[in-house]
Amino acid sequence: DELEIMPEDEGMSLHTDFNEEVVIDGNLSLIGSIFRNLTENAIAYSEGKNIFISLVKNNETECCIRFEDDGVGVEEKQLSRLFERFYRVDKGRSRQKGGTGLGLSIVKHAVLFHGGSITASNRPDGGLRFDFSLRKH
């Protein structure tokens, strides 16, 4: 239940590609917050219609997951600041959409808590891409 996300209610489609089972010994609430906050961010700011979540790597020690949307992306110079607390790319649009500016910071700290790392980049064909890893044990 914690991981159930409904972007369809906001007019977006969720596409997943997990070709094998992933088991992580971690805090379910924090792992849920990673997916929830990334999804809420995509719904609020991407202006796209699709969210893609895929398993990139799954081995004995870690799994790597890619979370993407097909929106407009952000300027390259802002990518490094996306995980800062209270940072907003477009301050005017953020006020209209609500939120605290903490979502992506929460994502980063939840990933770090699980011994992983996270990066943000623009997709070549538009939108944002988040690649993150989670240690299994």
Predicted regions span which residues?
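Conserved catalytic submotifs in the C-terminal HATPase_c
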Residues: 8, 13-23, 60
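A residue-level detector for a conserved hydrophobic packing site
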Residues: 31-32
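Short helix-loop "hinge" at the ATP-lid/N-box region of the Bergerat-fold HATPase_c
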Residues: 42-43
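Conserved glycine-rich
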Residues: 49, 115-116
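Short beta-strand/loop element within the Bergerat-fold HATPase_c
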Residues: 50-61
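Acidic ATP/Mg2+-coordinating residue in the GHKL
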Residues: 69
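Short conserved segment of the HATPase_c
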Residues: 74-88
